[in-house]
Amino acid sequence: MAAGWWFWCVSVTVAVALLIVCDVPSVSAQRKKEMVLSEKVCQLMEWTNKRPVIRMNGDKFRRLVKAPPRNYSVIVMFTALQLHRQCVVCKQADEEFQILANSWRYSSAFTNRIFFAMVDFDEGSDVFQMLNMNSAPTFINFPAKGKPKRGDTYELQVRGFSAEQIARWIADRTDVNIRVIRPPNYAGPLMLGLLLAVIGGLVYLRRSNMEFLFNKTGWAFAALCFVLAMTSGQMWNHIRGPPYAHKNPHTGHVNYIHGSSQAQFVAETHIVLLFNGGVTLGMVLLCEAATSDMDIGKRKIMCVAGIGLVVLFFSWMLSIFRSKYHGYPYSFLMS
C-alpha cells in the first residue's frame, strides 16, 4: 500500500515538473512575440509623428507590413511619383492620400490601429514583383489578421481617388471612421468674387441700356452651356474625383475612355461634351437652314453641314456608348 502511494506521488511530481518545463519555452516565445510587436508599433508611431504617410522600401514593407506579429492595419499606396514615370494620376492620388493621412494623424480619434504607408516603384520594385502588381496607383489594405482579401484592394477606376471615397472604403474594411479635413482653398471664393465684380461692372457700364439682360440668344447660349456640362458627367467628376486618364506603366498606352459603365475619366467628360456640342451645332444649322431668309445656296450648304455634323458626332457618341455598355446591339456608321 505504501509502495503504491509512493509511486503515485512520484508520478504526479514528474508530471507537474514536465508541465512547468514545457510551459517555460511557450511563455518565453509569447513574451518575445509581444516585444517584437511592441517594437514594430513604436517604430511606426515614431515615423507617423514625423510624417503621416510612411515611405517604405522592400525591407521595411516585408518587416512591418507582411511579417507577423501584427495587431494593426496598414493602408499602403503603391505608386510611381518620379518625374520620368510621367504618372499624372499618381501625383493627384498622392495629394488626396496625404490629405486623408493628415486628417487621421491630427484627429482626436487617432490610435495605433491603422497606419498609412506608400511604396514607390523606384524605391521598392521588388514589392511590386512580389505582389504581381503592374499598375499604379493602387491602394491595398493589409489587415491586422490574415492576408488581404479581394475587397481589401481599392477599386480606383470605379470610386475615384478622392480622400472622402478612400475614407469610406477604409471604414468598410477596418471599422475606423476618418473625418476628412481639407486645407482651406480660397480659389473658389476668389473666382466667384471676380465673376460678380465683372458682372457688376458690366451692369454699371450699361446701366443706361439694360436690353442685354433680355437678350434671348445670350440666355439660350448660357443655358446650353450648362446643359452640356451637366449631361457630360461633370457633376459625377466633382463628387467622385476620378483621374483625368489612365496610362499603362508598361506599354505607355493612355486610355481616355473607361471600359466600364460604372466609372469614367475626366477626359471622357470633355470628349462627350465635345460630341454633344457637335450634335447641337448640327441641329442649329439645320434649323437655320429651314427658317433663314438667306439665299438658297447658303441654306443648302448649312443643311449639308448640319446633317454631316449630326451624323458624324452622333455616330462617335454611339460608339463610345457601345464600348462602355458591352453587348449593346446598335451602332451607326462606326462600330
Curated annotation (Swiss-Prot):
Q: What residues bear carbohydrate chains?
A: N71
Thioredoxin domain span: 47-175
Which Gene3D superfamilies does the UniProt record give?
Answer: Glutaredoxin (3.40.30.10)
Q: Which residues lie on this side of the membrane: Extracellular?
A: 30-184, 231-270, 322-335
Gene Ontology BP terms: protein N-linked glycosylation via asparagine
GO CC aspect terms: oligosaccharyltransferase complex; plasma membrane
What pathway does the UniProt record associate with this protein?
A: Protein modification; protein glycosylation
Q: Where in the cell is it found?
A: Cell membrane; Endoplasmic reticulum; Endoplasmic reticulum membrane
Q: Which InterPro entries match?
A: OligosaccharylTrfase_OST3/OST6 (IPR021149), Thioredoxin-like_sf (IPR036249)
In terms of one coarse class, where is the protein primarily found? membrane
- Disulfide cross-links: C87-C90
Concerning Pfam families, the annotation shows:
OST3_OST6
Q: Which domain of life is it from?
A: Eukaryota
Q: Does the keyword Transport apply?
A: yes
Membrane topology note: Multi-pass membrane protein
Task: Give the signal peptide as a residue range, or say none if absent.
Answer: 1-29
User: Transmembrane residues, as ranges?
Assistant: 185-205, 210-230, 271-291, 301-321
Q: Which UniProt keywords apply?
A: Cell membrane, Disulfide bond, Endoplasmic reticulum, Glycoprotein, Magnesium, Membrane, Signal, Transmembrane, Transmembrane helix, Transport
The chain's coiled-coil residues are none
Where are the Cytoplasmic topological domains? 206-209, 292-300
Q: What does this protein do?
A: Accessory component of the STT3B-containing form of the N-oligosaccharyl transferase (OST) complex which catalyzes the transfer of a high mannose oligosaccharide from a lipid-linked oligosaccharide donor to an asparagine residue within an Asn-X-Ser/Thr consensus motif in nascent polypeptide chains. Involved in N-glycosylation of STT3B-dependent substrates. Specifically required for the glycosylation of a subset of acceptor sites that are near cysteine residues; in this function seems to act redundantly with TUSC3.
PANTHER family linked to this entry: DOLICHYL-DIPHOSPHOOLIGOSACCHARIDE--PROTEIN GLYCOSYLTRANSFERASE-RELATED, MAGNESIUM TRANSPORTER PROTEIN 1
Q: Which family does it belong to?
A: Belongs to the OST3/OST6 family.
Assembly notes: Accessory component of the STT3B-containing form of the oligosaccharyltransferase (OST) complex. OST exists in two different complex forms which contain common core subunits RPN1, RPN2, OST48, OST4, DAD1 and TMEM258, either STT3A or STT3B as catalytic subunits, and form-specific accessory subunits. OST can form stable complexes with the Sec61 complex or with both the Sec61 and TRAP complexes. The association of TUSC3 or MAGT1 with the STT3B-containing complex seems to be mutually exclusvice.
What name has this protein been given in UniProt?
Answer: Dolichyl-diphosphooligosaccharide--protein glycosyltransferase subunit MAGT1
- Source organism: Pongo abelii (Sumatran orangutan)
